[in-house]
């Protein structure tokens, strides 16, 4: 009898050509967006010498992403999903070309950067929602956990590589190179995506887009299972906003500039380990309970993080948070895809991703407010323990999620 390994199985990339194409396109896209993420704040800072102006660009892009996720969810449930993905990627690339041309001007326009940031934020998130909605059809619902873990690794790897490349390009060629290569990378992603099969949405009655979006909201609120998953995801994202306290906590621990980097690397490293060791997660009989417990553990790790007497112990707490949050996120992703009707996948994925974006912004704002009234240590601990208390209450209240059981997929020779 074959025994399921703890390690992530990458065989999905070999057996499912469509998922392999998405994997390749996603990795190139993450690297391209990383080049953009380095260039935009640097260019605005050089032009204005104002951190407020840099923050404004991030806020505007985030707002456009939120709207794009909402619109993308409706479009993904009404139109052929492959066309939505290709349209979003191509249109996003046009925005990158605009940023490149603007950077080459003798006096680049700040307004153009803001407007193109809105453009790219909207269309980038539009494609994300359609791709999420199409994933079950590409890999089969029984392989969603494996696909989610591979995707998480892709995101983490790309997020590490792209800032390094972006920094080197800034040092050697300036921001125009970053924008130009980001545009080239985005158009290159169209090549593997063109090989995807047609991804039509399920047949459903035509209705006004706002009414369609409201139907998604109603489903989310009416379903204790799916609604509970989305709520946990938002709270977990709020906890990850603890990174806004890193500089202040680094002063408290008397860390050097080089050591501060370990704080920023700890959560992604823990999450990567969580994805790599997720081989048995799909075989959990009670994924809802495991999701709740891993989320509680993540909140506890954040609660203890700021209380550590040495920075290295704080890094361990952050890595533990990254690992537990990866476990919870993979379970959230898989259960959301399997428990949502096919006709609702676009809207529910859009709402789930949007609440993750919103949760991060709310968490950062709350921690900033606490930081004005408390010490950094007290702020980190108070936020963590507050979320832990809410998590315990949800463990008691979300009865359907806690008691949810599933039949584990059969282990085959190729899975072991």
Swiss-Prot record:
**Annotated keywords:** Cell inner membrane, Cell membrane, Membrane, Transmembrane, Transmembrane helix, Transport
Periplasmic side, ranges? 43-55, 105-109, 178, 240-256, 308-313, 378
One Pfam family in the UniProt entry: MFS_3
One Gene Ontology term of the molecular function aspect: enterobactin transmembrane transporter activity
Q: How does it sit in the membrane?
A: Multi-pass membrane protein
Positions of transmembrane segments? 22-42, 56-76, 84-104, 110-130, 157-177, 179-199, 219-239, 257-277, 288-307, 314-336, 357-377, 379-399
In this entry, the parts of the chain located on the Cytoplasmic side of the membrane are 1-21, 77-83, 131-156, 200-218, 278-287, 337-356, 400-416
GO cellular component: a single term? plasma membrane
InterPro entries from the entry?
Enterobactin_exp_EntS, MFS_dom, MFS_trans_sf, TM_effector
Please, which domain of life does this record's source organism belong to?
Answer: Bacteria
Localization of this protein: Cell inner membrane
Q: Matching CDD domains, A to Z?
A: MFS_MefA_like
> Which family does the record assign?
Belongs to the major facilitator superfamily. EntS (TC 2.A.1.38) family.
Role, per record: Component of an export pathway for enterobactin.
- Give the protein name, as stated in the record: Enterobactin exporter EntS
Give the originating organism: Escherichia coli O1:K1 / APEC
């Amino acid at each position: 009898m074959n025994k399921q390994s703890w390690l992530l199985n990458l065989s999905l990339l070999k057996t499912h050509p469509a998922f392999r194409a998405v994997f390749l396109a996603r990795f190139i896209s993450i690297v391209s967006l990383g080049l953009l993420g380095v260039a935009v704040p640097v260019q605005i800072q050089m032009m204005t010498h104002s951190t407020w102006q840099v923050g404004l660009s991030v806020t505007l892009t985030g707002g456009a992403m939120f709207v794009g996720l909402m619109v993308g969810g409706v479009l993904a449930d009404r139109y052929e999903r492959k066309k939505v993905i290709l349209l979003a990627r191509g249109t996003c690339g046009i925005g990158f070309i605009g940023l490149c041309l603007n950077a080459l001007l003798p006096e680049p326009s700040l307004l153009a950067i803001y407007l193109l940031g809105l453009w790219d934020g909207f269309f980038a998130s539009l494609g994300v929602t359609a791709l999420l909605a199409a994933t079950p059809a590409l890999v089969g619902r029984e392989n969603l956990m494996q696909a989610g873990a591979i995707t998480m690794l892709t995101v983490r790897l790309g997020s590490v590589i792209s800032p390094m490349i972006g920094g080197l390009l800034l040092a050697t060629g300036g921001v125009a190179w970053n924008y130009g290569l980001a545009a080239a990378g985005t158009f290159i992603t169209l090549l593997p995506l063109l090989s995807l099969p047609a991804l039509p949405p399920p047949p459903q009655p035509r209705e006004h887009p706002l009414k369609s979006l409201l139907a998604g909201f109603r489903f989310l609120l009416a379903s204790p299972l799916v609604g509970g998953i989305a709520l946990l995801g938002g709270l977990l994202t709020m906890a990850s906003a603890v990174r806004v306290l890193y500089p202040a906590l680094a002063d408290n621990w008397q860390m050097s500039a080089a050591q501060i980097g370990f704080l920023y690397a700890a959560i992604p490293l823990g999450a990567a380990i969580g994805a790599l060791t997720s081989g048995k997660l799909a075989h959990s009989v009670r994924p809802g309970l495991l999701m709740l417990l891993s989320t509680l553990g993540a909140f506890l790790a954040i609660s203890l993080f700021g209380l550590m007497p040495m920075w290295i112990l704080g890094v361990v707490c952050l890595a533990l948070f990254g690992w537990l949050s990866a476990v919870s996120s993979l379970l959230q992703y898989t259960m959301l895809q399997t428990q949502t009707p096919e006709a609702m996948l676009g809207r529910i994925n859009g709402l789930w991703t949007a609440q993750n974006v919103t949760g991060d912004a709310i968490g950062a704002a709350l921690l900033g407010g606490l930081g004005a009234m408390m010490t950094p240590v007290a702020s980190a601990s108070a936020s963590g323990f507050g979320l832990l208390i809410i998590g315990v209450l949800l463990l008691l209240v979300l009865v359907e999620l806690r008691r949810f059981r599933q039949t584990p997929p059969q282990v085959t020779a190729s899975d072991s």
